[in-house]
């Protein structure tokens, strides 16, 4: 039995249930094969993903199951037999985009009645969203949430033969499903989920409500997946979780994320290890030492601080102060001097004053992040912050946001300037999206580097001398 699962059987989907889902996969594969024989064309799907890396990885699982069913992927919605939107509800803008896409699909559905339209992901965990879609977008065939992804074959089979919208959304925490097919595209980098859910309940965040409470995969299952990726030729893995630093706490046998990192570091074939996301309150000394001591762990840490004001951090329920965060960063830099730090920042949280915002700018100057993902505060229905008084006016948010961007852009460029003339190790990931003669990759510190190369170097580690620096990327030439 896998480590840590003895008392946690109920959080795993049973082998019998997974076998039952496989039968639906086989049924759909047979139907698609008959259609292919008749028409000479494979059935096509178009999968659109919104949101975080967890959603991206969920979409890889959907793609893996669809490949087993005999579908081929297309970017062209108009030629698709199946359209899926994997949704995000962290920001309002992502939700509005989904509604826009669904509205545009109605004429296509009228032209192609057999087209199956599916919507899944975090948005669907909100009952009011499901009701809105059923009422306003009745041409949608299938709605399911985050907790029953493994049931997609059964749900798709039902939707293909239903005259009404099939809805299957669970309000429980969900179970862990092992051995779901995964379609990873580039063959160089891979995401590996180590845990699901979040227990932190930050007052602005909808994630604990739509992803459930924390559930850790067993270490044995994770290590076996990473070993398989090493055998398949993947060079870099990113360990995923809403809060990876909490990994193992629910297992109850002392298993920790630092221990997992040390075990993953031993696996042959894997050259680089990354992880995301880390909560400052849970980042232990042991994890810092593991990052320092494990040669495959990249010198990059994404450590969201969200706001610089201790008063606002308390309102956010972040459970650390401004001083706590600065002291933690000092400890990290003491042990890993060349660490590249990135972060998340929310501007305009309810009650934020100019003095509070000045604390945010102060952290930028003191820590000097390589990059920051910055957001205007967005009300999320069902979160405590949405009900808070003293909401910050939009024009004030936008003015502060602009100052934040200007400050961070300057710091990012100043940091990148220090790379001019240096030789850096780069993992070659593929061809640039804008120039097929230019290849792109990342340093251990997660800097994007563009350079001339050839396809034979994809998946290889090369040394690149930096000749040009920009705010968000570097350019150079391979040192032969």
From Swiss-Prot:
Specify the superkingdom: Bacteria
Which Pfam families does this entry report, sorted A to Z?
A: Radical_SAM, TRAM, UPF0004
Q: Which cofactor does it need?
A: [4Fe-4S] cluster
Could you tell me which residue ranges the TRAM domain spans? 417-480
Q: Which UniProt keywords apply?
A: 4Fe-4S, Cytoplasm, Iron, Iron-sulfur, Metal-binding, S-adenosyl-L-methionine, Transferase, tRNA processing
SUPFAM superfamilies listed in its UniProt record: Radical SAM enzymes
Name the EC number(s): 2.8.4.3
Q: Where does [4Fe-4S] cluster 2 bind?
A: 198, 202, 205
One GO CC term of this entry? cytosol
Molecular function terms from GO: 4 iron, 4 sulfur cluster binding; metal ion binding; N6-isopentenyladenosine methylthiotransferase activity
* Compartment(s) where it occurs, according to its Swiss-Prot or TrEMBL record: Cytoplasm
The reply on keyword Cytoplasm is yes
- Enumerate the InterPro entries for this protein: Elp3/MiaA/NifB-like_rSAM, Methylthiotransferase, Methylthiotransferase_CS, Methylthiotransferase_N, Methylthiotransferase_N_sf, MiaB_methiolase, rSAM, rSAM_horseshoe
Record-listed [4Fe-4S] cluster 1 binding positions: 52, 88, 122
Q: Which residue intervals define the domain MTTase N-terminal in the entry? A: 43-161
UniProt remark on cofactor binding? Binds 2 [4Fe-4S] clusters. One cluster is coordinated with 3 cysteines and an exchangeable S-adenosyl-L-methionine.
- Known role: Catalyzes the methylthiolation of N6-(dimethylallyl)adenosine (i(6)A), leading to the formation of 2-methylthio-N6-(dimethylallyl)adenosine (ms(2)i(6)A) at position 37 in tRNAs that read codons beginning with uridine.
Protein family: Belongs to the methylthiotransferase family. MiaB subfamily.
Quaternary data: Monomer.
Protein name in the entry: tRNA-2-methylthio-N(6)-dimethylallyladenosine synthase
The record lists the organism as: Acetivibrio thermocellus (strain ATCC 27405 / DSM 1237 / JCM 9322 / NBRC 103400 / NCIMB 10682 / NRRL B-4536 / VPI 7372) (Clostridium thermocellum)
- Which lineage do the record's taxonomy fields give for this organism? Bacteria, Bacillati, Bacillota, Clostridia, Eubacteriales
Q: Which gene encodes it?
A: miaB
């Amino acid at each position: 039995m896998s480590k840590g699962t003895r008392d946690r059987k109920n959080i795993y989907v049973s082998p019998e249930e997974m076998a039952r889902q496989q039968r639906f996969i086989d049924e759909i594969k047979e139907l698609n094969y008959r259609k292919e024989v008749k028409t000479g064309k494979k059935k096509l799907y178009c999968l659109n993903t919104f949101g975080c890396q967890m959603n991206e990885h969920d979409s890889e699982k959907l793609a893996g199951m669809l490949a087993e069913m005999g579908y081929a992927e297309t970017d062209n919605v108009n030629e698709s037999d199946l359209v899926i939107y994997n949704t995000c509800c962290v920001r309002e803008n992502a939700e509005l985009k989904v509604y826009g896409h669904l509205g545009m699909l109605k004429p296509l559905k009228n032209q192609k009645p057999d087209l199956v339209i599916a919507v899944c992901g975090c948005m669907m965990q909100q009952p009011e969203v499901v009701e809105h879609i059923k009422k306003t977008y009745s041409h949608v065939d299938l709605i399911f949430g985050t907790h029953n992804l493994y049931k997609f074959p059964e749900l798709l089979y039902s939707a293909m033969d239903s005259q009404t919208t099939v809805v299957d959304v669970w309000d429980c925490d969900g179970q862990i499903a092992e051995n779901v097919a995964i379609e990873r595209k580039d063959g160089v980098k891979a995401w590996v989920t180590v845990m699901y859910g979040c227990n932190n309940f930050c007052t602005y965040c909808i994630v604990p409500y739509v992803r459930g409470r924390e559930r850790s995969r067993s270490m044995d299952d994770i290590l076996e997946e990473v070993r398989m990726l090493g055998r398949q030729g993947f060079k870099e893995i990113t360990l995923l979780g809403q809060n990876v630093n909490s990994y193992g706490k629910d297992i109850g046998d002392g298993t920790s994320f630092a221990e997992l990192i040390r075990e993953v570091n031993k696996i042959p074939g894997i050259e680089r290890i990354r992880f995301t996301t880390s909560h400052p309150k849970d980042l232990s000394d042991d994890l810092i030492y593991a990052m320092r001591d494990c040669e495959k762990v990249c010198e990059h840490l994404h450590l969201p601080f969200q706001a610089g004001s201790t008063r606002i951090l308390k309102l956010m329920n972040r459970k650390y102060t401004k001083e706590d965060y600065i002291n933690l960063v000092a400890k990290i830099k003491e042990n890993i001097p060349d660490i590249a730090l990135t972060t998340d920042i929310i501007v305009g949280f309810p009650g934020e004053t100019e003095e509070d915002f000045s604390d945010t700018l102060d952290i930028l100057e003191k820590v000097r992040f390589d990059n920051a993902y910055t957001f205007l505060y967005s009300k999320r229905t069902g979160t405590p912050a949405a009900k808070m008084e003293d909401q910050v006016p939009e024009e004030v948010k936008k003015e502060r946001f602009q100052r934040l961007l200007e400050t961070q852009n300057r710091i990012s460029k100043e940091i990148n300037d220090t790379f001019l003339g240096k030789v850096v190790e780069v993992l070659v990931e593929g061809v640039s999206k804008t120039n097929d003669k230019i290849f792109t990759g990342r340093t251990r510190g997660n800097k994007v580097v563009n350079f001339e190369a050839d396809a034979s170097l994809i998946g290889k580690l090369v040394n690149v001398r930096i000749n040009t620096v920009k705010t968000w990327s570097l350019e150079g030439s391979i040192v032969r």
